[in-house]
């Protein structure tokens, strides 16, 4: 029985901490949500442009290497 309690204790502590975290969290208000959404969109756009320019630079380099 002692082994069962010893085995189940980490799971029980994790569940207890998780429930406490969920109860403490709050939903973002409209302004905060918009700020997060805009920051995420800007990040996606920047990463997209970086990928586009890297691809744009590597296409001619690849054609030079493969073309010869």
UniProtKB/Swiss-Prot annotation:
GO terms for cellular component: Sec61 translocon complex; Ssh1 translocon complex. It is a single-pass membrane protein. It comes from the Eukaryota. Residues 1-32 are cytoplasmic. Residues 62-68 are extracellular. Keywords: Endoplasmic reticulum, Membrane, Protein transport, Translocation, Transmembrane, Transmembrane helix, Transport. One of its GO terms (molecular function) is protein transmembrane transporter activity. Pfam families: SecE (PF00584). Its main location: endoplasmic reticulum. It is found in: Endoplasmic reticulum membrane. GO terms for biological process: post-translational protein targeting to membrane, translocation; SRP-dependent cotranslational protein targeting to membrane, translocation. InterPro entries: Prot_translocase_SecE_dom_sf, Translocase_Sec61-g, Translocase_SecE/Sec61-g. The chain crosses the membrane at residues 33-61. PROSITE patterns: SECE_SEC61G (PS01067). Belongs to the SecE/SEC61-gamma family. Necessary for protein translocation in the endoplasmic reticulum. Heterotrimeric complex composed of SEC61-alpha, SEC61-beta and SEC61-gamma. This is Protein transport protein Sec61 gamma-1 subunit. The gene is SEC61G1.
């Amino acid at each position: 029985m002692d082994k069962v309690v010893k085995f189940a204790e980490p799971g029980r502590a994790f569940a207890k901490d998780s429930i406490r975290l969920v109860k403490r969290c709050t939903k973002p208000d409209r302004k905060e949500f918009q700020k997060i959404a805009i920051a995420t969109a800007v990040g996606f756009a920047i990463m997209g442009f970086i990928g586009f320019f890297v691809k744009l630079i590597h296409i001619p380099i690849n054609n030079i290497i493969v073309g010869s």
